[in-house]
Amino acid sequence: MISVNPSTSNLEKLDLHNLPAEQTALDIKNLDLYYGEDQALYDISMRIPNNRVTAFIGPSGCGKSTLLRCINRMNDLVEICRIEGQIDMHGHNIYGKNVDVASLRRRVGMVFQRPNPFPKSIYENVVYGLRLQGVKDKRVLDEAVETSLRGAALWDEVKDRLNASAFSLSGGQQQRLVIARSIAIEPEILLLDEPTSALDPISTLTIEELITDLKDKYTVVIVTHNMQQAARVSDQTAFLYMGKLIEYADTDTLFTTPSEKQTEDYITGRYG
């Protein structure tokens, strides 16, 4: 049996299928995705609540990361990719005709599997996005660096060496730096694509504790191949299989009393 973090199971239960608009960060409606003639996602519909951690789980190739990348339109970069359906972010379709994709990606931060700091100092990594936005005031930048590094639980470890190369940090520290860089531009939503898969157990635990803290300010969506991790950090979990959303429920419900046999088979290790 997979144990669920008590802090998540004690949260108010939400009716995920009838979530009020004011509690909904993302409303995914009848989403289909194709790579050329091959369909990768099939009629995905789900509502992701504000200021909660939502996990996408499922076997390799099930569509977890593909769905995640729809949320900030990273799939636009794939020439043969075509999307039908829509995703509303706080009531506005992010696939609408007049959407500024660059602006959308400022509102939706993303952290990938492997830490990808820029070849710059720790300080310059954090302020990179702010500089792109035209922020030049050193006081504003300094405050953003401290606030973001504190938010990523890294400030105390690097405050005396902000001008050191980001590459001088450990893997776990680099991943927290990337998170700090993402939150420096104050996104509304933070996407994490298997953020601990390349890290050691101690660094993984630090990131997991950070994820739990981040939901105080952000809506967090995490893709993970690790079911135990999903149970530890998430409030809701969506199980995908072969591009289809099989089940979406509060994490403790999905892991203890799943309603679909496919879900039960997966979490008990019968396949996947």
From Swiss-Prot:
Top enzyme class, one word, equals translocase
Q: Can you say what this protein is called?
A: Phosphate import ATP-binding protein PstB
Annotated GO biological processes are: phosphate ion transmembrane transport
Main subcellular location of this protein, as a coarse class: membrane
The record, for InterPro entries, names: AAA+_ATPase, ABC_transporter-like_ATP-bd, ABC_transporter-like_CS, P-loop_NTPase, PstB-like
The subcellular localization recorded is: Cell inner membrane
In its UniProt entry, the species of origin is given as Idiomarina loihiensis (strain ATCC BAA-735 / DSM 15497 / L2-TR)
Q: Name one GO molecular function term.
A: ATP binding
The ABC transporter domain is annotated at 26-267
Reactions catalysed, semicolon-separated, are: phosphate(out) + ATP + H2O = ADP + 2 phosphate(in) + H(+)
Entry membrane topology: Peripheral membrane protein
Tell me, what does this protein do in biology? Part of the ABC transporter complex PstSACB involved in phosphate import. Responsible for energy coupling to the transport system.
Family annotation (NCBIfam families): 3a0107s01c2
* Key words of the record: ATP-binding, Cell inner membrane, Cell membrane, Membrane, Nucleotide-binding, Phosphate transport, Translocase, Transport
Q: Which PROSITE patterns match?
A: ABC_TRANSPORTER_1, ABC_TRANSPORTER_2, PSTB
What EC number(s) is this enzyme filed under? Answer: 7.3.2.1
Question: Which Gene Ontology terms of cellular component type are present?
Answer: plasma membrane
Instruction: Describe, as the record does, how this protein assembles with itself and its partners.
Output: The complex is composed of two ATP-binding proteins (PstB), two transmembrane proteins (PstC and PstA) and a solute-binding protein (PstS).
Q: Which family does it belong to?
A: Belongs to the ABC transporter superfamily. Phosphate importer (TC 3.A.1.7) family.
